[in-house]
Amino acid sequence: MMNVSRPAIHPVDALPVAPTAGAIDRPPVRMKDVQGMPGTTGGLILRLSQFVPALISVSVMVTTSDFRSATAFCCLVLAVSLQSLWSLSLFIIDAYALLVRRSLRNHSVVQCFTIGDGVTSTLTFAAASASAGITVLINDLGQCNVNHCTRFETATAMAFISWFAVSPSFILNFWSLATH
C-alpha cells in the first residue's frame, strides 16, 4: 500500500478582535427601506396614486342618476369608497412618518397594512369586474342612449387603475411581512 498523506485538522485559537474607538457608539446597521414600503416616499406616491383614481371613480359614479339601477354599480361605489378612505388614511400616516422621520417597519403595522391592502384590493377588483360586465351588457343590448355608458365605463376604468396601484403596495407589504 502506498503511503498517502491525509489531511489533518489542527484547531487554531481565534484571538478576539477589540472594537475600534467609536464602534460602540455607532447604531447597528439597518437595511434600507425599499421604495413603496410604508413610510417611504415611494409608498406615499403609491398611496396617492391609489386615492386619486378611486376618488374619481366614486365621483363619476355618484353623479349619474341611475347608478342604483344595478347592484354591481352600488357595490362599485361602496368598494371604491372604502378604497379611497383606506388609501387616504395610509397616505396621511405615510406623510406623518416621513415628516417625523419615523420608520413604519413594525411587524404589527406591516401586518395591518397587508391585510387592509389585501381586503380593499380584492373588493375593488371584484366590484370593478362586475361593473365592467354590466357595462358591456348595457352596451350589447343597445341601452346606452337611456343609460350613462360613458360615465359607467370611466368609473369602472378608474376603479381598475386604483386596483392596479394597490397591487404593488400589497405585494411589497406581504413580502416584508414574510421576510420579517
Curated annotation (Swiss-Prot):
Name of a matching Pfam family: CASP_dom
Segments in the Extracellular topological domain: 63-72, 139-156
Domain of life: Eukaryota
Disulfides per UniProt: none
Compartments, as annotated in UniProt: Cell membrane
Keyword Transmembrane: yes
GO cellular component, one term: plasma membrane
Assembly behavior: Homodimer and heterodimers.
UniProt-recorded name of the protein: CASP-like protein 5A1
